[in-house]
Amino acid sequence: MMSPEEYVNQPRDTKRENDVCKWLRAASEHEKFEFVWRAIRLNPGLGIPLVRTAQLRPVYLEVILEHGFVYGDASTVRLWYEATVSGLGDRKVLQLLSAHLDRAPLIVNKMLYWFRPSDERLLPEVQELKKKFEAKYPNFKSSRSTGIHATGT
């Protein structure tokens, strides 16, 4: 099997991607995560699509989503969210997001834009989080789109 370094340094190829996904599904949990994690760190554009197809355990998906919260910009954070939400569930994503309200407002701000739970019963909780965010950070603005804290005024 190829290494993550080899995988991300080659042009996209559907056959190769399918072979890697087949191997990942048969690999141990740790091997799957290790390969996907290294691929993500080297080239998120090629690594993120592996997240969903590798069928990772929720604990690994949390690590990946938290990384995406911090290192995904205002647009790409959506890719991290979409790659992990089916394995974590909307409620867990909302819990992870809510946990950042006090210390990482930039994460909450950029994710609230994309977060659309498929479970309509969660919509009141999402609205409540939006209200808390707006009350806590009434004039929130940031001159950057990655990291955890706002910059500027």
Predicted regions and their residues:
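Amphipathic alpha-helical scaffolding segments comprising HEAT/armadillo-like alpha-solenoid repeats
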Residues: 2-3, 26-37, 56-68, 90-100, ...
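Inter-repeat boundary and helix-capping residues of tandem alpha-helical solenoids
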Residues: 70-71, 87
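Long, helix-rich interaction regions
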Residues: 1-15, 73-77, 99-153
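Structural detector for internal amphipathic alpha-helices that build alpha-solenoid repeat scaffolds
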Residues: 5-26, 35-56, 76-88, 107-118
